């Protein structure tokens, strides 16, 4: 039976082995992805929006290529993973614009993507549900730091935007908990970074402009 990238990592971690790549080209694709991400980070730090408009979506496309080369389309959890990455790509493209409409579109795309990540984690198997408390702790800390986000969202877009942001918080919380519950440290750290980065983004969007 074929295994998805996430399932192969889960299986290998339980055997204390390193998973074997499904394609010999995955190493090159991973290196290319890392290079694009490094370039995108440089563009963000240097405020090179012209470069970021290219590297941000390119990084997600490269991640999709890595997942595909790893055999993600062969299993249910892998297909959920691919769907999540596609919606992440859409969200990144939407957030390259500054308008409120693009922000809401990006928020919606990421919300759907996070639901697909949850489905991928659940399908792959949550062997250590107790670890979900780590995800809950990360979410709680982020909400404490960003306690002004919802009032800021209400001031910026009224009840509709407030409801959308609140729904997003719930979904990303579910992703954090389910990600940690897989029992995989790297997955847990990854979802935690997502929570932190989205909190920073929301603070910049809804809190700092009002300060």
What are the functions of these language-model segments?
Residues 1-15:
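Low-acidity, Ser/Thr- and Arg-rich intrinsically disordered low-complexity segments
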